[in-house]
Structures are given as structure tokens and as C-alpha cells.
Amino acid sequence: MLLVLLTLILPPLQGAVETKDYKASLFGIKSNGTTLNTRSIQKAIDFIHDRGGGRLVFDVGRYLTGTIYLKSGVTIHLLEGAVLVGSPNPFDYDTQHNWTALLFALEQENVGITGEGGVIDGQGFTVANNLVDLIHKGLVEDPLRNDRPREAIRPQNIYFWRCTGVRVEDITLKDPASWNQQYDQCREVTIKNLIIDSKSYWNNDGVDIVDCDTVEVANLHIDAADDGICLKSHDKNAVCQNVYIHDNVVRTSANGIKFGTASLGGFKNVRIMNNLVYDTYRSAITMAAVDGGFVEDVVVDGLKSINTGNVIFLRIGERWQPGKKGRMKNISISNVYAEVPEKKADAGYNYEGPWEHQPRNISPSSIVGLPGAPIEDITLKNIEIHHPGGGDPNFARVGLDELDKVPELPSNYPEFSMFKELPAWGFYLRHVKNLTMENIKLVAEKKDYRRAIVIDDVEGARIKGLAVKEPGPKKDPVFIYKSTGVKIEK
């Protein structure tokens, strides 16, 4: 079934052309971990590219380097025990582009980074702190907000821009100084079978897919300080589309799988299947259209979320383009099992998420549009959420007679906790059109003053097979406010 689905969604992916193997040692590339190999590695890549392509193969050892550029037809191949090590010196990285990276590929075809258990180690903590030191000494200019350099001047492990036919497979990517890997306006991209350890510094995303077309993200094991798998749209004239995300395991101190926050263009035709999110501070799945762009035609099927602070967060906003609200429609989320903890889900991990938007009781999943800009055509099916409950009105309270006091916050950064206290513990649904909820099971472990579901300004909703279990006096699980066409069936 998955093979058939992949064939339907993605055309055949063209990988790097592996016509011949070249050992790194033939080019004088040293494996001692102390010799800076930037020039010799680049000469090797240029040599292979000029001769029609092939693989530059690294055997056991530690290969220190600054910025290198992949070229068409060339694959870097890391054998087991081979480690490509980023230089700790910030001046060894190229800063002439919008982003800084250890490995660049710009407007190339059939490029790849593959391996048999090899590693790319960005030494991000050391690089970032050395960069901070240079900024304090006046040798590098940066506003240094919160004593952190901007993301763009800290090296990512991988940055590919406008490339076609990309393969990144069977390696470990660890310790970037910024995002771990970014694929920007690329086509025909395969990212699979990776171990991603991304907890060395702030903004350590696992993988970022930006305005790309035809992408497969599969079998990744991600441990990240920031968003795990993140789709972005930086260009208002571009779309991130035809993306298939499946069979991944994600742990983050932010969101497991996220659309946005940058959402200038849009996201279309995305399939997210059979993924596990655990020990994650924010939401298992977040979709945000807050910068004038759109999200449409998305299917999430098969999501297990364990010890995750929130399950589902869908949000329309109006952040960077005043007067142009985001749009979101045709979203299906099904076959979800989730456990929300009472305590902080990422406690003890490096770079924990901040305990934000207090005071509030433990938040519900939420689908929130804007007045006059509803989120449309939403299906939630076969979803089971175990929530700690315990909402205490003496700690924080929004009563059912105070729903108009819940702020709209169209220009705020979108986060599941952004509204502070909400009047529901299971689902908060506001500014939605055409909603279907089938076979939803909500379990609260403790008595909660809030209703399980609050429906506010919803036009057309069908709820069938709702099961709610919570201790305490029985109350109607659904509260409907300023809504039309809402039907609740057994």
C-alpha cells in the first residue's frame, strides 16, 4: 500500500550518478582529525565533477573541514567509522550566502551524501560559542540577541538550494550550530535512514524542507532541540508540495512535525503517515498559515504521540503581511493515539522549551482560524487522546460565559499555548467551516472544570461516535457557541 501511495504522490527520484568510486586518501585528504581538509576535499569534488561524476569515499577516520561545495554528479560517501568534522573556527565557513553551512550545493543536479553508518559532526556548540566570542571582540558583526548569534550566520550541517535529484541516506547528522539540514527550493529529494542528533545549540531543527517539490522523508530517528521535521515557505511565489513523510521517530523540545512558521507561499499535497512523536514539549503536529500563505490537501494517517505536550494545533494568522490572512482547507487527520503528560514533556533534555504563556491549565488540541477566515473542510477520525485533566479554575479560568474574552492574536507567533487558558481540555475549535469528527475518544485522568470540547463560531459540523471519560459529576462534553449547523450523533 505504501509503495503504491508513494508511486502516486512522487515521480521516480533521480539519485546521484555513481559512475565511479574515488578514495578520499588519493587526494591527500587527511583522516587525523587535526589537518584542515577544506581545499583538498573541494579539489576532489571538482575533479570528480569534471570527469562526469562519482562517489568521493571516506574510510575510517576524522576529516576536519570548513565549507565545501558539492557539484553535479558527485556523492560524498561515508563508510562506517568515517566522520566529517566541522571546523571549530567560524572563519572557516563561507558567509557570502543567505545561510552558512558546512556542506553546500547550489543549483546542482544529482548530488548526494550517503553512507554505511558514517557521521557528519558539525561541532555546533563549539562553533557557536567561538562565534559569540568573535562578536564580543568586534571581529564579527551581529546584534547577538539573548547572547545568541543569528541563525543565518551559524553553520548548518547541510544547505542545498535549487538542486534537483538529491539523496541523503544512511548517515548520522549531529551537532549543528543552527538548523541541521535545509533543502531550499529543491526537487526530487530523498532523505531517509538517518540518525539526527540535533541538541548542541539553539534552533537545532532536525530537517527543514523549504518550498520544495517532490520529497520523501522516511525512517529518520530525530532527537532535536527545536522542531523535528519542519516544512517552511520562505517565498510568497513558491509552494512546498508533493511531500511524503513516513515511518519516522521524532523527539524534540519544540514541535514534532510542523508546517511553518514561515508560510509566505504555501503547502500542498502532503502525506504524513505512520510516525511516532515522543518526549516532545510542544505539539505532535502543527500546521500554521500565518504569513499570507496557505495549507491545503494534507493527510495525516497513523500518528502515535507519547509524552507530548499537545497533540494537534492548526492555526490561521496574519503576521508578516497585514491585510492578507492565511488560508487552510482540506485537512484530514486520522488514526491517532496520544498521551499528554501532566509534567513538562522534555524535562532534562538539552535546550528545553520555555514554560510559556502562563498561567494556564494543560492546553487542549486546537483548530483556530480568524473571524472571516475560517479553517475549512477538516476531518478528524479515529483519534484517542489521554489527557491529565485537572484544570483548576483557581489557577486559571475562562468560563463558558467568557468565550468572547479569548483573544484572537492574529499577528502573534503561533503556538498551541498562545491563548493562555482555554475553556476546553480536549479540543478547542474556533472559526472553522465544515468540520467532521468521527470516533473520537477523550479521556481525562482528573476532574477538570472545563468541557471536553468547545465549539465557537463553527459553520457546519458533524460529530459522530464521541466518547468522553472523565471523573467527577457528569456534564455535557460539548459546548456550542455562536455556531450553526452542528450535529452530534451517536
Positions of PLM-derived features:
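Sec-dependent signal peptide recognition
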Residues: 1-5
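Extracellular/periplasmic carbohydrate-active domains that bind, remodel
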Residues: 6-490
